[in-house]
Amino acid sequence: MPLLHADMQREVIECFPEFIDDRQHDEVVESLLEQMDGNSALLPPVLDALSNLHLDDALLATVQHKVMPKLQSAELQVLPLLVKFLLQTAGSGAESTSVLRSIRDLDVTALRLGFDEGDRETKREREREGASAESLVIDSLRGGFRCNFAITTVVLKELEKTQTEHTPMDVWMLLVLHSLPGHRPKVHAICRKQAKRGVLTAAVVRRAVAASLSALREYFSEALALAGTLTRDSNPMPRRVGSAFYHTLFVTFEEDFHRQEVLQGLITHTGSASAREVDCALEVARELSAQEPHAADLRRHLQFVQNIMDYMEAFADEQIRTLYSIFANLSLSAMRSTGSMPMDDQIHILLRKQLGHPDALYKRMGILGATAMVTCFGAVQHPAATDATAADAEPSACLIPAELLKYIEGMLEMVFTSCVGKPGCLAFAYDELALAFEQSNCTKVDERILTNIFERASEDFEGGYLLDLGDDAALSPAPMPDWLSLKSQAWMNLDQHNAVIILNVLPLAASALSSEREQLTTLCSLFRLLVSTTRLTSGSVEDIDAVLGCPLYMMAVTTSTAGAASAMTSSDSINIFDSAFRAFFSNLPRREKELVTKCVFVATNWTRELLNGFCMEKSTEMRVKTRQRLRDLVGLERKLDICLEFLLRLMVSS
């Protein structure tokens, strides 16, 4: 053999199994292993010859022991042959576990390691060789599993009991096993179990799939099926891995067919009755829409994304916010590429229809969508902002082009206009805006948007709910209906004679006009929005601290004990005043009972909002007033309990 030419040596070795007697196998194997150690170029024919010889268990173990160390240093062209040989010759005993572990330790991400940047042609050739080697390694896994059923059982057991983080090779094995008949349920169970343990992670999935496009193209449907199974799991950790599968498949496989399949899988999840599935699918789409160039890729399949809207009626509020954030991101992506705002796109048309719909459900969806899009558009630093505009702005301000600002203002006006005469919807719109501005991603909203909303909220609040007090904080009489016998009184006046405003509660609650009575529905929501915008524009709520100590325009509690209670300062005064209020309330006619209950309910919610708005302030004066408001809240809740107790009796008796 040493005297023969290399090509002749390969041909002779390949012919060994045809003319060697079984009794000579030991000597032949020893010779072949020596040839393999002496000349790595002979490794392929040696492996081919060894796989066609009849070897006993001891001799086979010797061969495997010699071959396994060559896995880590094998050339790209030889590696698939080594993998296939080891899998086909592995049994079901302990040696098969060693064989499997040596294969699992392969760093599949290193198959495409190129040369230095200076040798570009060689690097591209190396990358092509790596891609081909990846495909051949996966083919060798499939061939080994199909030819040796015993090893598949060992593989499944080893993967299931793994306690450390899985490798990309493990993911390849799972995908190959998933493609073989009869193994799908077991592979699904292993993936869910290992994901729950935290050893099958999103990072492993990304490493296994992202760098192996050509190799895994045949197994795209297997990866998609695994993604769906993991996303449907009730545990958040498998869902996280399922999301990584979907995200990586969309980014890695650039063909339209593959991306449409990924989107169709996500759409299927959004139509599920499981809120967890919907959240997971929407979050994947949101992440893709928030990143370039993935947002541009997603826009090319916008029709598929819009199919999610078919399930919107079943979505929770947060899911609707996420959905419209996706569309807002895609609109911004289109604006960056075209330079203009799509004013008549389908999403804008849908929002107009929802906001104009008489059904509160659709109007609510429109408010959620419009608010999500406003905050998304307003929080983005757009490259179209001019240098001059940027120079005039504060460093922390987020500047957006005039066209986009006009679009946002128009959408806000559309929201407020659609809520005219519908206080419940208007209160919800205020709450949505306040919630959006309190979130961390809105700290860079264009200050012009915040200022416009603050000015509108401030004007509506002052004009709708505050009255001026006379000299020495005297309460001016307000018009009351004829049926009302209650006298008016200022409650909870912390500013005493310095008070200049009072919160108008009783006159609004007792008004003969339904529009004025319904104004109280939006009181707390509007104040919450006012606090949010004030804090973002000024850094604190000192500009509106006058409302913290101002009194409430309420009814006088006219009993013999009420005056004594109001004069006391000990903790017993609350109990005495509760007794006085109970006596006062019990003697009222039903209509006045309902009115007083409404006033106390409004006062309770108002005090709670004051605490929410001012509890973080550092000023000593405001902290003292806040503590007093906390005491007031306790007293109001006791009064509200008394009111509800009596009203419940009336409802039962009637």
Where are these regions (language model features)?
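Eukaryotic, compositionally biased intrinsically disordered regions
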Residues: 25, 229, 294-297
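Helix-turn-helix repeat elements of alpha-solenoid scaffolds
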Residues: 23, 148, 216-221, 256-259, ...
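Extended, well-ordered protein cores
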Residues: 191, 204-205, 226-238, 242-251, ...
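Short, hydrophobic/aromatic alpha-helical segments in well-folded domains
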Residues: 15, 31, 226, 245, ...
